[in-house]
C-alpha cells in the first residue's frame, strides 16, 4: 500500500512515499525522526484550522509503523450492504449518515464481526459477504488517550425484505436504503471517511 489516509473527524493526515501533489494539502512534511513526527501529530490534533497534512517518506512501512506507535490501536469491522433492488444500507448516528460497524470482540473473526454489527445495528438477517473493501482509519480521544481505529470493510449482498430496526441503544436513530443516485446529495450529512468509501465503492 502506497498511501494511508487517517481521518481526524473531517480532517485528515495522508501518509505517503512521496509528496502527493495531486491533492490540495495545507502542509507537507518529510519524515526525518519520530520526535518531529509526534510533534506534528500533536499540533494537528490541537489546531483545528489545519484541514490536511501530507507526511511522506520513501520507506513508508517505517513511517506508518512509527505513526501507529503514537496511538493505542483498536479494530473494528463493518459492511456496505447492497440489496438486490440496487439500494445500499445506511444508518444515521449523531446526526450523521454512516455505515453499520463496531468493535471487534476478543477472539472474534473480522468477517463475523462485520456481519454481526450489520444485524445488530440495522435489524436484518441473511446478508452475506461478497468481498473485502479497503480499510479506513480514524482517530479519537477518550480519557486522555489517543486511539487509532482501523475499520475493515466488506461489501455484502442481501435479498431479504427491507424492513429495518435501528439499534437505539447505540445512538442509531434511522436505518435507510438509498439508491446510488441519491448519494451525491448527502455529502453535508456524512463523514469525509464515509464519502471516500462511497466514492471508491459505489460512485466511481
PLM region descriptions:
Residues 104-193:
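Unchanged
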Residues 28-31, 82-120, 124:
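Conserved Nudix-box catalytic region and its N-terminal flanking loop in Nudix hydrolases
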Residues 34-78:
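Acidic, metal-coordinating catalytic segment for phosphate/diphosphate chemistry
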Residues 13, 20-23, 96-98, 106, ...:
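Short, surface-exposed beta-strand-loop junctions and turns on beta-sheet-rich folds
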Residues 3, 76, 149-153:
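Short hydrophobic/aromatic beta-strand or adjacent loop that forms the aromatic wall/cage
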Residues 1-46:
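N-terminal leader/capping segments at the start of a protein or of a new domain
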Residues 81-84, 156-158:
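Active-site beta-strand termini and strand-to-loop segments that position acidic
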Residues 193-204:
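Charged phosphate-binding loop/patch that engages nucleotide di/tri-phosphates or the phosphate backbone
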